[in-house]
Amino acid sequence: MKKIIILIILTLSLTGCTKTKKEQINVLNWSSYIPDEIILDFEKETGIKVNYSTYSSNEELLAKVSNAKKGTYDLIFPSDYMIKIMINKNMLENIDKTKLKNYSNLNEKYLNQPYDKGNKYSLPFLAASTIISINREFIKDEITSYNDLLNTKYKNEVVLIDDERIIIGMALLANGFDMNSVEKNELEIAKEWLLKLKDNIKAYDSDSPKSFLISKEASIAVLWNAEATIANWENKNIENVYPKEGVALSIDNFAIPKDAQNQEIVYKFIDYILEPTIMKKIIESYPYKNVNKETDKILSNKYKNNIASNIPDYIFRKGDFVENIGNNIKLYDKIWVDIK
């Protein structure tokens, strides 16, 4: 009897030792970018646990990854200029495209961008543009330019993205300068322009600027196109306009941090997201510009016929990406403190 009991105990012990740990992936992404149902469906389909956390700016992303223990994050979604910064800091793994059966679904026009020639370290996930949203219930004037926002009638009516590069870049564009200028005299003019705008500013908000429009707390906003699209869906009085001076562009990308612990699982997750039907759900939930050419074929007319969600090619050609300006960022930092 004792021998039998010992054998049972040994068998149970060995079973416990051979039990495999559940696979998991640690994802760090922008808020709202991937609906919860997509994550849950991936977990059900694969048995892989997704630990999902968010950030609200590229700088916050950089700080989180820099300060975390090596291997903390497996997949991140930096924007264009941040990809370049992280490449220069040796913070990203090379992307092995041969592990992605859905790589060919990506639209070539969003590949091989200046911040990562050859897509050695990143792959496009979503594209975006800034845009002006106007609630026509309250604003009857024609608005075609950033300079129209200076109208004193709009006191406490304007919401801006809480992003110094985008908003100082907007002021530079409004004055006919390059959005990434580091010329001190041009930056001083941009600063004075923003100080003129100050009385009109209701709030700076990067998380949900559309909420101010939908709730009618503000009548005008400079925001990203997905937020503008949702505002229009919620309230048909909200009109979206691309300013004549040009816009800020952004591409958010899949990227694998250096020393990521679960890289094979990362490729499974990226491939899942690149499935046309999965990308359709993501795009139509949070309507940024789609970069998946197979998804283009199945998108709804609601998405395709909205100029805010489906950014026209001519707008993309005219727009500018935020560029890495090195230590000159201190010039922007000082202006940001002064105008806020």
Where do the PLM segments sit?
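Early extracytoplasmic/lumenal segment of secretory-pathway proteins
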Residues: 17-85, 211
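Mature extracytoplasmic/periplasmic domains
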Residues: 257-316
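Extracytoplasmic ligand-binding site segments that recognize negatively charged/polar headgroups
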Residues: 72-73, 77-200, 205-217
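Periplasmic-binding protein-like
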Residues: 128, 187-196, 202, 234-258
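Extracellular/periplasmic bilobal clamshell ligand-binding domains
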Residues: 299-340
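Ligand-binding "clamshell"
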Residues: 87-94, 116-120, 230-242, 304
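A ligand-binding cleft/hinge motif common to bilobed small-molecule-binding domains
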Residues: 83-85, 214-215, 220-237
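A bilobed periplasmic-binding-protein/Venus flytrap-type ligand-binding module shared by bacterial periplasmic
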Residues: 131-138, 173-174, 250-262, 270-273, ...
